[in-house]
Amino acid sequence: MFCYHESIEKKDLGKGVLFQYLGKGQNMNVFHWNMAAGSVVALHRHPEEQFGYVIKGGFEIELEGKKYTLKEGDAYFIPPDALHSFVAIGETEAIDVFAPIKKEIPGEK
């Protein structure tokens, strides 16, 4: 499977958060995120593991009550069911991989 950036729909979650669903394999799915400076993904948890890579900008991540600052080129791993949030530091772009496949797609019911 191939994904061509121009042909993938961008979904606007509001408050400066956009994402593209890049697709899924047998055991994982992948998202591309764009976040405006200062935009927030509020505290939440999910049963999937989450691995991410910061392409541009950065995040302040709160993970289980501790805060971490990540910048361009940094990666992160969030264990299943861990309480976490993101605040974009500057215009931020990132890739997230979820395993097993994340069934709840942001912005869909």
Q: For the regions a protein language model found, what residue spans apply to each?
A:
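A short, N-terminal "cap"/entry segment at the start of jelly-roll beta-barrel domains
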Residues: M1-N27, G107-E108
